[in-house]
């Protein structure tokens, strides 16, 4: 090798076994390699001279050269060559057309380095081994993939090439620490000026190469669809390292070709950076961290699980020029409540009057002193809670603060009183509830008005079900109206998030008049179908101006349902006989009498409903939960497209808001509340204990 002619250069001696025959087995090669460990010194220091730096292996330690080296001098070669394995002698420019045959034991050596003759330097095209994979750079030139098992000898070859290109040099003694066991310090015959010039040329070459760009989580497939702003990509710089210093580098894994949007870090130690602006982890190239948007994930804990202690640092790279920054991206406005700012005091609101008092709390009409806006203030009942915050109110706050839909009442914030037991929810003010409006009306809603209200109600329920939430207490008193014709769903005290597969829940949900038959019969595995049954009851109540099934107990409620819709059986409702309450004997009713309540043409002034409208009502009140219509299918029903068309919100009837005195003396025919039923059963004050106790 050329390094031998400039005394003082001695490379590492690595035993490499050559395959002399194509048919020699791998075991024979390993046996021969074990018996002759001193043969075939490493004379391939000039192999792959024109390739860029890659990952190198020496004595079990991986070393990385962060930059390419200048191409070596091409030599004419003759003769035939054989197949090459990783680590074998190669000649020429290091391209796939060059190689060397195995060395013989009797060949001369200089300074411990075996020299290869020109006749032995060329390989036969027929026996040339195909090298893969092939990497194409930006200029269209083909480069061979880096060999991950090459040792530190490539670094020696870099210095050897510098010496080979100079005619006069200044001897420089570089005492380097040995890399691994069995290696001694190297004596380098290098010109200081040449090394500095080589580093400058290499930095220029690095700037001409294409580098992968950094990218944050906002541009990944997990980002919001509304975040369509143009993200700025900041290219990551490399730190130039001399060939001698690269020997002492720590290990790092080889980076494969990046996919679009993949974050690559070319640092010499395994580290990761955490952007303080976006809270997104940007790890090393062999890590693939994906943070799903919307999940409450502790970034610090996620990082500690994947990286050892001391490796999660803010921009933990070598030098300021190696620091990668995640640019700030403007996000679209979203539903977000900053709880860290603290809650406002209830004293910042002026009380006007009391709106309603129910099972879950008292509702006041107040004015915000800061903005002058009229809002509703709902006080959470805490006197019966001994173990902390009420679970029903906690669920309601959690759901309403995370939802934003025109058909769902908006919770603006949570405020506190003088002590920790006075908790209030600030909600948008709605003048009426649907039940109170219907009781003040002299005539029921027309079909066009019912269509307008049902469309808004179905859109809100569809939004809940699409977000895996069951309301479980839909009724006319939980539907709010304003004088602009808008309907909003409220009172999420019994709502629950559900998943797949379904989990068993309590059957004591939904106010009795709007409770689905599977709940009345004791089913604990239920889904969105229970809300759709409630919508059917509400639709019938809107058309008739009265409750559809006004039972006084669970048995009475089932009896009224069966008398109207017919008694179910296994043919109508598969699985009916397996329900706990199916053992109770009810009167046999074979016909569906629902049509008798809603005539297509009425001469007596009763509620009218077209054939399409009756079909929708009948599908909402289907016994089998699996066959009951969904909110999405109900929105696409033909009843909403036939005449008369749904009335516009602006033309819906308006009513004056009731004052506190009118509400106090107003007697509502209220249906039993599910929570009151449970309390009465626990206290043993309910004479009719229903089907289950």
UniProtKB/Swiss-Prot annotation:
EC number: 2.7.11.22, 2.7.11.23
Catalytic activity entry: L-seryl-[protein] + ATP = O-phospho-L-seryl-[protein] + ADP + H(+); L-threonyl-[protein] + ATP = O-phospho-L-threonyl-[protein] + ADP + H(+); [DNA-directed RNA polymerase] + ATP = phospho-[DNA-directed RNA polymerase] + ADP + H(+)
Database matches in PANTHER family: CELL DIVISION PROTEIN KINASE (PTHR24056), CYCLIN-DEPENDENT KINASE G-1 (PTHR24056:SF403)
Cellular component GO terms held in the UniProt record: nucleus
Modification Phosphoserine, positions: 500
Domain Protein kinase: residue ranges: 349-640
Lineage: Eukaryota, Viridiplantae, Streptophyta, Embryophyta, Tracheophyta
Active-site residues from the entry: 473 (proton acceptor)
The keyword Kinase appears for this protein: yes
Record's compositionally biased regions (Acidic residues): 297-307
Induction: By cytokinin.
Name listed for the protein in its UniProt record: Cyclin-dependent kinase G-1
Alphabetized UniProt keyword annotations: ATP-binding, Kinase, Nucleotide-binding, Phosphoprotein, Serine/threonine-protein kinase, Transferase
Compositional bias ranges of the Basic residues kind: 26-39
PROSITE patterns: PROTEIN_KINASE_DOM, PROTEIN_KINASE_ST
Biased composition (Gly residues): 1-10
């Amino acid at each position: 090798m050329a390094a031998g002619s400039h005394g003082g250069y001695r490379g590492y001696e690595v035993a490499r076994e050559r395959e002399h025959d194509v048919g020699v087995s791998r075991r024979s090669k390993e046996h021969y390699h074990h018996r002759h460990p001193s043969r075939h010194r490493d004379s391939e220091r000039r192999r792959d001279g024109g390739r860029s730096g890659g990952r190198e292996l020496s004595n079990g330690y991986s070393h990385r050269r962060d930059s390419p080296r200048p191409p070596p001098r091409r030599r004419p070669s003759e003769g035939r060559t054989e197949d090459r394995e990783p680590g074998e002698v190669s000649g020429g420019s290091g391209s796939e057309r060059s190689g060397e045959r195995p060395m013989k034991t009797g060949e001369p050596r200089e300074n411990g380095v075996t020299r290869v003759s020109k006749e032995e330097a060329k390989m036969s095209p027929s026996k040339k081994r195909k090298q893969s994979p092939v990497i194409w750079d930006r200029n269209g030139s083909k480069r061979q993939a880096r060999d991950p098992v090459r040792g530190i000898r490539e670094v020696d070859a870099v210095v050897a090439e510098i010496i080979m290109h100079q005619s006069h040099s200044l001897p420089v003694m570089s005492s380097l620490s040995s890399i691994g066991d069995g290696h001694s310090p190297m004596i380098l015959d290098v010109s200081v000026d040449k090394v500095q010039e080589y580093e400058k040329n290499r930095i220029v070459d690095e700037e001409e190469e294409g580098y992968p760009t950094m990218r944050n989580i906002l541009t990944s497939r997990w980002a919001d669809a509304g975040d369509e702003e143009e993200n700025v990509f900041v290219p990551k710089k490399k730190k130039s390292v001399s060939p001698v210093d690269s020997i002492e580098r720590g290990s790092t894994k080889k980076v494969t070709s990046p996919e679009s949007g993949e974050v690559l870090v070319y640092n010499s130690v395994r580290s990761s950076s955490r952007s303080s602006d976006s809270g997104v982890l940007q790890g090393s190239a062999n890590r693939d961290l994906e943070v799903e948007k919307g999940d409450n994930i502790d970034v610090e804990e996620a990082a500690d699980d994947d990286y050892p202690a001391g490796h999660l640092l803010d921009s933990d790279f070598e030098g300021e020029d190696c620091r990668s920054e995640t640019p700030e991206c403007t996000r679209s406005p979203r539903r977000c409540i900053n709880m860290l700012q603290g809650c406002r005091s209830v004293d910042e609101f002026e009380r006007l009057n009391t709106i309603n008092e129910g099972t879950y709390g008292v509702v006041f009409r107040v004015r915000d002193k800061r903005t002058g806006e009229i809002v509703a203030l709902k006080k959470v009942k805490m006197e019966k809670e001994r173990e902390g915050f009420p679970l029903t109110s906690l669920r309601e706050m959690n759901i309403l603060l995370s939802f934003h839909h025109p058909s769902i009442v908006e919770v603006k914030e949570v405020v506190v009183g003088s002590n920790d037991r006075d908790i209030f929810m600030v909600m948008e003010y709605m003048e009426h509830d649907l039940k109170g409006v219907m009781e003040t009306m002299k005539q029921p809603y027309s079909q066009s008005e019912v269509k307008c209200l049902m469309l808004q109600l179905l859109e809100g329920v569809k939004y809940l079900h699409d977000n895996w939430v069951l309301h479980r207490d839909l009724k006319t008193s939980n539907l709010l109206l304003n004088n602009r014709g808008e309907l909003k769903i409220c009172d999420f005290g019994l709502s629950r998030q559900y998943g797949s597969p379904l989990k068993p829940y309590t059957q004591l949900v939904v106010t009795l008049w709007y409770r689905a038959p599977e709940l009345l019969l004791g089913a604990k595995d239920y889904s969105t179908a229970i809300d759709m049954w409630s919508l059917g009851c509400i639709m019938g109540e809107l058309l008739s101006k009265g409750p559809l099934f006004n039972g006084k107990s669970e048995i009475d409620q089932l009896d009224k349902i069966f008398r109207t819709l017919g008694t179910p059986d296994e043919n109508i409702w598969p699985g009916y006989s397996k329900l706990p309450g199916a053992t109770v004997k009810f009167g046999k009713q074979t016909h569906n009498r629902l049509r008798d309540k809603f005539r297509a043409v009425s001469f007596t002034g009763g509620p009218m409903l077209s054939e399409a409208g009756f079909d929708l009502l009948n599908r909402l009140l289907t016994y089998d939960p699996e066959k009951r219509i969904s909110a999405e299918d109900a929105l696409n029903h033909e009843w909403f497209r036939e005449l008369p068309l749904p009335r516009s919100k602006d033309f819906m009837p308006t009513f004056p808001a009731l004052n506190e005195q009118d509400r106090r003396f107003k007697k509502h025919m209220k249906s039993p509340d599910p929570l009151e039923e449970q309390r009465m059963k626990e206290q043993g004050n309910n004479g009719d204990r229903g089907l289950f106790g």
